[in-house]
Design a protein with these regions (language model features):
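N-terminal secretory signal peptides that target proteins for export/translocation
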Residues: 1-17
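Accessory carbohydrate-recognition regions in carbohydrate-active enzymes
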Residues: 36-392, 396-440, 446-514, 521, ...
Length: 822
């Protein structure tokens, strides 16, 4: 449910601010002693958050960064939605929060009862009866459980069956408990179907002995991407009494092998004598390498001493892993729903990228060859256009070991695939989305020390990407707009430009230019740090290329503001649509957004952006209009739903803040960057109301943990608004106390007495390790030392206080020489 708004507390007027600050200083002398994380912290996660509307999360079981997931399949392309009325099966591969069709659900398994044979309940003479849409089971939400590492649901068809799932990194387990005490219970293993709109191109299934089924399936995935193969193995805890396979021609009792082609039915059934036990446990594993990889993974994580691990043991191991991961961040304050929302966000931020190498270290690279990761983990599934904005930084902050291996993985992709990725899916590049997200992503990894020992290799790959384009025969698109960008300073807007995937940069020339400039500025800082002075200077200048697409004459008719980014054509002219009028609210030239929303994507050059908007006062007014600031301050609990963009795919004909998509995620902190941090606090508090303990409790697609990571940073009071800079902007925390174990032996401690997520509160002052801290930001070098941050909060906005002086604002690396914020 959504949190019930509470009446605003009456601001205290009995103690002056100095007295409150003195009290805070006294508190700083005592050590922070947050209670240890609860032993059942995994139960504070609600995996159903994001499973309704378009959050596109999955409710089933996964380990942190797991290779395998077990979750229900319904009628949606991402797997299952909370309001689906049937479960078609339990798939074994899912992405969390992605917004493209053709994804996941491979190896659809469902327990059923009834007769299988000629003329039976499952008539082997009719292949259509083995379609998982036809045999899908009804179910009930009553008693349904979605915890970190554990899922349970009651199937109400077939006499009633309890289905449970748990997962370790490379192996999973399902337990099916039938209500019937006699007759046969069957497990259908469907390899010819997966999630809705995810076509199986070819599949093979083999029944081995009386306990095993294994095989492979080839799918073409993610918005028309390249095909790839998933191998699987399932072992049961007791022998099946009968078996068979089905294919295009129907079912064959007793058959052990079936191979079918594109979109053809294919699978196997295994029959168990329920008089000998009502429960059947299946332990499964998958691999993207080969059949032996799936077997190796099952032996390594689903067995011990040659015997299958029991379901309960695997659940214990899975949830112990989650308990440790979740316990690295501890919060105090708020209510039960606040804690659930927070820890569910931590959970979702740690699902991806997914482990890509098998237990023996082997993985399938972007050259389709087999490689080995010795002593490190190779990862797969990188939604970089999304994750470079918040999730990458969250992992670097809390899991530096994972961040290091992610960096190593991206360099392996570059080495084996010939170029750096943008949206990597399994072992291929999809070329989904636009811009140059890999550059700020990797520069942040460098900034956070995750590329240590590989800085030179990373620089070479990033420089090649920034100054060139992949060859035509490469799957990678890279910066496809570079030919005009390097020559003229902007990406041409050309809807006819040939694409290597669904997206290509010139189709969205306006936003691509802004993304390139942001990336160049980030890379300039890396070049400077590595001693490449000439490249640093060139890239720094290119970091101001957002100005090349800023048209000072464009006027928004309704609000009266003048000057917006606008796409340009090959001849250098401003793009003008057929009707002769360009609107900054239109769809022309910007990817999943409008010029109104993209105008803020120049945070690397705040003085220049403010100058383009006619000064700080006008920039502030424009932000006020963008966020509906008057409405937010009047009704912070509800204004976001009334005033901002609501639909997750309502990209165009908009001028307000869109909390459902990535281009705007940093924009609340533009207020802070121009010296109005109290307004950042108001926007962030209003936006947090959109994250609730409910199936629709995330904003838009969660995008592999991106929205969840945004929420986490918003809740603890620091945010990385300028990629590549290492600057974390400070704002009002949601919780009174926070501790973050940073993976380097140090702990970040945050103290905000009186923090209340249902009230507008503003920062009156900050202390770092007991010393007054006037700047509105903290550098990564200081943050990684594990300081104690103390926030003094008040209900009154300090329009002349903390964070309002220009000297206390971070310097924009790519501001023009001599420019100042005015």
């Amino acid at each position: 449910m959504r949190p019930v708004p509470s009446a605003p507390a009456v601001p205290s007027t009995s103690r002056p601010l100095l007295a409150r600050l003195a009290c805070l200083l006294a508190l700083s002398a005592a050590p922070m002693l947050l209670q240890a994380a609860p032993t059942a912290l995994e139960r504070e996660v609600n995996t159903f958050i994001g499973s309704k509307d378009d959050g596109n999360t999955f409710p089933g079981a996964s380990a942190p960064f797991g290779l395998i997931q077990v979750s229900p399949i319904g009628s949606h392309y991402s797997g299952w939605r909370y309001d689906d009325d049937k479960i078609r099966g339990f798939g074994h591969s899912f992405i969390s929060g992605a917004g493209c069709w053709e994804q996941g659900g491979q190896v659809s398994v469902l327990p059923v009862t009834g007769s299988i044979g000629p003329g039976g309940d499952f008539d082997t003479g009719n292949a259509k009866q083995f379609d998982h849409k036809a045999y899908a089971s009804n179910y009930t939400h009553d008693g349904e459980i979605g915890q970190a590492g554990y899922y349970k649901v009651r199937l109400t068809s077939y006499g009633g069956i309890d289905a449970e799932a748990t997962a370790r990194t490379r192996a999973a387990a399902e337990r099916y408990t039938f209500s019937q005490r006699s007759g046969d219970g069957h497990v259908l293993v469907n390899v010819g179907q997966a999630n809705e709109r995810h076509s199986v191109i070819g599949s093979v299934v083999d029944v081995v002995g009386d306990r095993v089924v294994e095989g492979k399936l080839v799918t073409k995935s993610f918005c028309g991407g390249h095909q790839y193969t998933t191998w699987f193995r399932i072992e049961f805890d007791r022998p099946f009494k009968a078996h068979g396979t089905w294919g295009e021609g129907g079912g064959l009792p007793g058959a052990r092998h079936s191979m079918e082609g594109e979109q053809k039915p294919n699978g196997a059934w295994l029959s168990f004598d329920l008089a000998k036990g009502q429960s059947v446990t299946a332990v499964s594993a998958i691999s993207h390498v080969d059949a032996e990889g799936a077997r190796t993974n099952l032996r390594a994580e689903g067995m011990q001493g040659g015997a299958l691990l029991g379901f309960d043991r695997m659940r214990t191991l899975s949830q112990q892993s989650w308990r440790e991961q979740l316990g690295r961040v501890r919060v105090q304050g708020g209510n039960a729903d606040d804690r659930t929302v927070f820890y569910s966000a931590v959970y979702h931020a740690l699902l991806q990228p997914m482990t890509g190498n098998d237990a023996d270290g082997r993985y399938r690279g972007y050259d389709d060859g087999i490689h080995r990761a010795d002593g490190w983990t190779y990862y797969e599934y990188f939604s970089l256009w999304d994750t470079y904005r918040a999730q990458n930084q969250w992992l670097a902050l809390t899991r530096p070991d994972v961040a290091r291996d992610i960096g190593r993985t991206l360099l392996a992709i570059d080495e084996q695939g010939g170029w750096l990725p943008r949206w990597g899916y399994a072992n291929f590049e999809t070329n989904i989305m636009t811009g140059d997200p890999v550059t700020p992503f990797m520069v942040d990894l460098w900034r956070f020390g995750a590329l240590k020992g590989r800085e030179s290799q990373a620089w070479d790959a990033l420089r090649r990407n920034a100054f060139g384009t992949p060859p035509l025969n490469s799957r990678m698109a890279g910066r496809s707009g570079n030919p005009t960008y390097l020559d003229k300073g902007y990406v041409v807007y050309d809807r006819a430009f040939p694409s290597k995937g669904m997206d290509v940069d010139p189709h969205h020339g306006g936003s691509a230019t802004l993304e390139y400039a942001l990336a160049d500025c980030a890379l300039s800082q890396m070049a400077d740090g590595l001693g490449h002075a000439q490249d640093a200077a060139t890239l720094r200048e290119r970091g101001r290329n957002w100005r090349k697409v800023w048209d000072p004459q464009v006027r928004d008719a309704e609000t009266g503001f003048t000057g917006f980014p606008r796409p340009r054509t090959e001849d250098g002219q401003w793009y003008t649509p057929a009707d002769g009028h360009y609107s900054p609210r239109s769809h022309h030239g910007f990817h999943e957004g409008t010029a109104w929303q993209y105008q803020w994507l120049a945070q690397q050059d705040v003085p220049g952006l403010v100058e383009a908007m006619d000064g700080r006062e006008q920039a502030g007014r424009r932000l006020d209009a963008f966020f509906a600031m008057d409405a937010l301050q009047a009704d912070p609990l509800n204004a976001a739903r009334k005033e901002w963009v609501v639909g997750p795919y309502s990209y165009y004909n908009q001028f307000r803040y869109n909390p459902n998509n990535e281009p705007d995620l940093h924009s609340p902190w533009l207020y802070t960057l121009i010296g109005q941090p109290w307004k950042t606090a108001a926007v962030v508090r209003a936006a947090q109301q959109l994250f609730t303990n409910a199936p629709n409790g995330v904003t838009g697609n969660d995008d592999l943990g991106t929205m969840s990571a945004w929420y986490l940073f918003s809740a603890i009071g620091v945010y990385p608004a300028v990629p590549g800079s290492g600057q974390f902007l400070l704002h009002t925390p949601r919780f009174s106390k926070v501790e973050v174990d940073m993976g380097n032996g140090r702990t970040l401690r945050i103290d905000a007495p009186g923090a209340d997520g249902r009230r507008l509160q503003y920062v009156q002052g900050v202390k770092v390790d007991g010393q007054a801290h006037a700047p509105v930001w903290l550098d990564w070098n200081r943050l990684q030392q594990g300081p104690r941050l103390q926030f003094a909060l008040d209900a009154k906005a300090p329009e002349q206080g903390w964070g309002t002086a220009v000297k206390d604002l971070p310097v924009s690396w790519c501001a023009a020489p001599g420019s100042q914020l005015r």
